[in-house]
């Protein structure tokens, strides 16, 4: 599996409240958030592409490349100019470094979750699906605050719609929310659908 992790944003909310390093480098439970993200997958079996803000990579105080490679030595580090255009833009800017033939997961850089990666892989290969979005619903501690995520509409476990930051109904706890992991059958399929999002101005 090819794991693509966009981490080229600013993290403005965290900087405003006093954090001195980019969000993926904030230490939680003894290690940087980005290490928790890597732990969701298999360092031995997967390939990793980290799409980084060039200013973060060039800042010697952050040691971003060292932090990533100390935990994931085979990581491919891609540097792109800083932007506020989101992860789809970051991935499309980095396509020269991403395999088009491999099954691909795009994963956000600032969370972890409890899941069975092996069960997830077994399901996607068994169903031969073109894409998959791990999702959850019901009460979770983060729902105590107004932190909206990407919400899904589905019918018989097939996604029919998805939208960011806004639930489809007033009862958001009963809607599926994306955890931030997006699987595509191939890098080509990911690229094509990301381009469609841009062309249709869905971002």
What does each of the following model-derived ranges do?
Residues 1-8, 13-15, 19, 27, ...:
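Conserved N-terminal catalytic core of the sugar/cofactor nucleotidyltransferase
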Residues 12-15, 23, 160, 182:
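Flexible, active-site-adjacent loop/turn segments at secondary-structure boundaries
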Residues 21-24, 66-67, 121-125:
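Glycine-rich, phosphate-binding/catalytic loops in enzymes
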Residues 24, 74-76, 158-161:
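Conserved beta-strand segments of alpha/beta enzyme cores
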Residues 105-107, 132-133:
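A structural signal for short, well-ordered beta-strand segments and their strand-loop junctions
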Residues 109-112:
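The conserved acidic donor/metal-binding loop of glycosyltransferases
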Residues 114-197:
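Conserved core of the sugar-phosphate nucleotidyltransferase
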Residues 199-203:
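Short, charged, surface-exposed loops that flank catalytic or proteolytic processing sites
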């Amino acid at each position: 599996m090819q794991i693509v992790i966009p981490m080229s944003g600013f993290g403005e909310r965290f900087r405003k409240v006093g954090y001195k390093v980019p969000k993926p480098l904030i230490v939680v439970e003894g290690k940087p958030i980005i290490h928790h993200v890597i732990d969701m997958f298999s360092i031995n079996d997967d390939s990793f592409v980290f799409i980084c803000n060039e200013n973060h990579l060039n800042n010697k105080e952050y040691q971003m490349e060292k932090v990533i490679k100390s935990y994931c030595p085979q990581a491919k580090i891609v540097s792109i100019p800083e932007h506020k255009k989101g992860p789809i833009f970051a991935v499309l800017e980095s396509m020269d470094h991403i395999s088009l033939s491999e099954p691909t997961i795009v994963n956000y850089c600032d969370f972890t979750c409890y899941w069975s990666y092996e069960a997830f892989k077994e399901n996607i290969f068994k169903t031969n699906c073109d894409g998959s979005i791990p999702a959850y619903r019901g009460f979770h501690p983060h729902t105590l605050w107004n932190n909206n995520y990407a919400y899904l509409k589905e019918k018989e476990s097939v996604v029919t719609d998805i939208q960011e930051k806004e639930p489809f109904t007033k009862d958001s706890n009963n809607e599926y929310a994306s955890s931030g992991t997006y699987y595509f059958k191939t890098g080509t399929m990911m690229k094509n659908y990301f381009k469609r999002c841009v062309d249709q101005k869905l971002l």
